[in-house]
């Protein structure tokens, strides 16, 4: 019985906690500590979200921006000045919605992920 309890506790630690927040623009954003990934659905087509993402990364002066995106899904990578890798995965959900996942570094960085997301969201809502 003790082994089962210890195993369940370990699984809980590995999976990590999930936190959710609603941005001022009304988007529900979740972040899983175990994965280090910020997830959300944005109102916008794949091309709109892709353009907003690339513009955001350029404005934040990230380097080595690489984009492999079509109208259904894609991946955008870049590096921060200190060498930390930023990975953004996009996937079209319906005709006017796009799923976005942002991971900063190996373990994830919630604060920087949220800052990138908010900039992307503002660009889309501004259009």
Model-derived features: where do they sit?
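Ser/Thr-rich, low-complexity intrinsically disordered terminal regions
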Residues: 18-127
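Positively charged n-region of N-terminal signal peptides that target proteins for export
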Residues: 1-4
